Amino acid sequence: RDPEMSRGLGDVYKRQAIIDAKRAGEIPSAELALVVASNASAYALTRAENAGIAHTVLRKEKGEAPENYGERLLALLRENAIDVVVLAGFLTILPENVIRAYDHRILNIHPSLIPSFCGDGFYGLHVHEAALKRGVKVTGATVHFVNEITDGGDIIAQKAVEVLPGDTPETLQRRVMEQAEWILLPQALEQVAGEIAKKREEKQ
């Protein structure tokens, strides 16, 4: 079971890419069980409603300790028997207790070929602006596990995308989404979910 966690235009399409891939039979090892948004106005909730996926909002209260928020999130994940978490623009930083509890079971996608253009400050259009400024000829996307270091977890999969003459951050962002992110994320989810299912079968 896999919860998707929520934001932004690109993130909306990432979630839809997962939903579409599941409908097409491309993610047989995972059930899309829950969408958790940190913002009640997140369009992820509408997407989930339209797809018949359970969804909820879990806000971090003002002044709430990260560990306490993490315990509330963990309780929600355990209540829904969640095995794998896919981050898609979830606005609240994941507390360390959640990362520890779901070690190598939280997936994130980053719009560059890590280790290039990643880490603190590299998000959204900033990534593509940096790639164009550096003059790279190839960029892409990376799906990786989440750990305590921003974009620092083990790499699951990468896909390269050509940078074209005349590209702007916006055109490059769109190409990376269409040619890499929307393809790579469902594939990585199936890979990880399949490995979890296989290990579970071997224990039986």
Report each predicted region and the residues it spans.
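Short, structured coil segments at secondary-structure junctions
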Residues: 8, 51-52, 102
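Donor/substrate-binding cores of folate-linked one-carbon enzymes
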Residues: 84, 88-197
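Short, well-ordered alpha-helical microsegments
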Residues: 15, 44, 93-96
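Glycine-rich phosphate-binding loop signature in dinucleotide/nucleotide-binding domains
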Residues: 76-83
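Single conserved hydrophobic/aromatic residue that forms the stacking wall/gate
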Residues: 1-9, 13
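Charged helix-capping and loop-helix junction motifs
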Residues: 68-74, 123-127
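Short, surface-exposed acidic-centric catalytic microdomains
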Residues: 28-68
